[in-house]
């Protein structure tokens, strides 16, 4: 049934950009604290975004935002952006893009303990003590190895079974895995 089909809404970068562009997807530096005006039907995009999140939550759907942070964005600023969207708009999690994302800083921030963070990799040694298993697994790694391994397997490429099975069975103790 449809009630069971959707469990989260993932938004592309939804921050306002410095200069309006056509066919712009938001993968450049922008105004990270301001919802994109063109996504709004009113003159109050922040209120409209909050209302959307509230409606989605009432229907059992989490809100995951995607943010791209270029290398020159400071670590403390990234933390403030994430905290703003969690506490001001009640966003449930983030798909983070960029090269130098301070994942350990975000993952160890007590105020973000229930916030889902998706990234390409996490240095669990910096986040957890020894082999601690978190009570709430809020970190997830995007695994594109799965996509390539399964493609090779589906084409019946030589030696493709073990990599495909390895990708399917991958289940680290401290993070989740999102296969795509």
What are these regions (language model features)?
Residues 107-180:
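Conserved alpha/beta catalytic core and glycan-binding cleft of carbohydrate-active enzymes
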Residues 1, 63-65, 94, 117-119:
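Hydrophobic faces of well-ordered beta-strands that scaffold small-molecule active sites
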């Amino acid at each position: 049934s449809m009630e069971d089909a959707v469990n989260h809404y993932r938004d592309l970068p939804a921050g306002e950009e410095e200069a309006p562009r056509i066919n712009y997807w938001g993968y450049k530096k922008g105004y990270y604290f301001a919802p994109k005006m063109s996504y709004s039907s009113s003159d109050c995009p922040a209120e409209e975004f909050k209302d959307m999140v509230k409606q989605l939550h009432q229907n059992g759907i989490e809100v995951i935002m995607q943010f791209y942070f270029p290398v020159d964005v400071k670590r403390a600023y990234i933390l403030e952006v994430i905290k703003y969207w969690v506490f001001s708009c009640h966003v449930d999690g983030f798909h983070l893009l960029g090269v130098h994302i301070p994942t350990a800083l975000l993952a160890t921030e007590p105020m973000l303990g229930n916030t889902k963070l998706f990234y390409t990799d996490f240095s669990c040694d910096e986040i957890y003590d020894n082999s601690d298993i978190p009570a709430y697994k809020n970190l997830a790694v995007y695994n594109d190895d799965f996509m390539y391994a399964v493609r090779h397997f589906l084409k019946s490429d030589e030696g493709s079974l073990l990599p495909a099975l390895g990708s399917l069975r991958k289940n680290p103790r401290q993070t989740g895995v999102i296969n795509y």
